[in-house]
Each structure stands twice: as C-alpha cells, then as structure tokens.
Swiss-Prot record:
Catalytic reactions of this protein: cytidine + H2O + H(+) = uridine + NH4(+); 2'-deoxycytidine + H2O + H(+) = 2'-deoxyuridine + NH4(+)
Protein purpose: This enzyme scavenges exogenous and endogenous cytidine and 2'-deoxycytidine for UMP synthesis.
Active-site feature positions: E63 (proton donor)
Subunit field text: Homodimer.
Residues annotated as transmembrane: none
Name the record gives this protein: Cytidine deaminase
Gene3D superfamilies in the cross-refs: Cytidine Deaminase, domain 2
Enzyme class, broadest EC rank: hydrolase
Length: 142
C-alpha cells in the first residue's frame, strides 16, 4: 500500500505501533480498544490509546491521546501520517466526529489517515479532507 510520501518501512512501523498501542487501551466499560500512531515530520512515531472513565464524558479517544503526545513534544505541524486500529476484525476503525475536528486543527486536507481492523489485515486510507469535508477550522475565525 502506498500512502503519500511515506516509505513502506515507515508505514509498517506505524501499523505495528498502532496495534501495540491498542493493547495498552484502558477500556473497561466499552471493551473496545483503539490504538493510534502518528509519524511526525522528523520521522518520530508517537502513540496513544483510548482511555475510558466511569464518568463517560471524561473518556479520551486514541487519536487525541496520540495527538497530545505529539503536541507536547513540540510538533505543531508537518505531520506525515496517522494510523488507527481498533477491536473490529471485520471493519477498519475510523475517527469519531470529535477526533476528526481535533485532527483537522493541526493537519492539511491531504493528510493521510490509515484505518485498520484489529489484526491489521484490512486497511483503508482516506485524507483529512475526505473524512471531514467542508470542515470548520482556524481560517473561519479570521
């Protein structure tokens, strides 16, 4: 699978990182684990997993968990790719609406998002622009 300018070895490393992050999920309520990995412009991989809470509104998705790691390391832009996986063998897991809006804040429209099933045997690639067409973003506030 070719994804943007990402090398095959980088994409495989991203997939492995997302699958491993999924194992670190804290999801005692939904029992649906999600993992995410992000490749930065200097080829560093950051990961995150969903973390649930008894007060459901306090849960955080894997995508935002990973993005916070990236942002706290000082990488505000220029990310290369995101990979998401979750506990569905039949379907590739896509970002929820909140995560789509959050991701949109920091990436360009052609930013590739690779969605995997639980084993990584199925994949679908979409861009941020495809996942959130006509997105509301920072330019609307100028």
């Amino acid at each position: 699978m070719k994804v943007g300018g990402i090398e095959d070895r980088q994409l495989e490393a991203l997939k492995r990182a997302a699958l491993k992050a999924c194992e670190l999920s804290y999801s005692p309520y939904s029992h649906f684990r999600v993992g995410c990995s992000i490749l930065t412009n200097n080829d560093v991989i950051f990961t995150g997993a969903n973390v649930e809470n008894a007060s459901y509104s306090n849960c955080i998705c894997a995508e935002r968990s990973a993005m916070i790691q990236v942002l706290m390391a000082g990488h505000r832009s220029g990310w290369k790719c995101m990979v998401i996986c979750g506990d569905s063998e039949d379907q590739c897991v896509s970002p929820c609406g909140v995560c789509r809006q959050f991701i949109n804040e920091f990436v360009v429209k052609d930013f590739p998002i690779v969605m995997l099933n639980s084993t990584g045997s199925r994949s679908k690639v979409m861009t941020m622009g495809e996942l959130l067409p006509m997105a509301f973003g920072p330019s609307h506030l100028n």
